[in-house]
Amino acid sequence: LTGLLPTPDEVDAFVKDRSLDAYGRLVDRLLASPRYGEHQARLWLDVVRYSDSNGFDWDEFRKQAWRYRDYVIRAFNHDKPFDRFIREQLAGDELLDGPPRTPEEQDQLIATTYLRLGPHDNAAPLFNEQDRSRAELMADLVETTGSAFLGLTLSCCRCHDHKYDPLSQ
């Protein structure tokens, strides 16, 4: 649950604990650990293609990307309902009536960073390829949203009908 091996002392304590609720208490302790949110967030961040940099040739550092990473960790550590977690990432800015006033409202806005996580080619504007760059960004977002939230691979539909799912080009 935390992505970390137990220490020898933790193993000994668990093996020696003969109470009926030993396993449940261990699970509760692991779920309450901040390491739980960090581990689960790492798995989620892989799914949504999180990176601290833009990729491509210039690979510039994204100075504020950590805010999204920390939002995801908090969401797991505070047991945020999954439907809320998804809604905030897809439309967190639309859930607000005005500027964010509370930490929870700030999180809703930070969650929409998901929409900008894909690789970004900073050289495209220099070579007058802004339209292609935007199209690639949108295609990446559609592909990632399909795989993360629908469990579907949509990238093949750019060129041909899907081999297994009822999705056409």
Enumerate the predicted regions with their spans.
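Short, structured secondary-structure elements
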Residues: 1-169
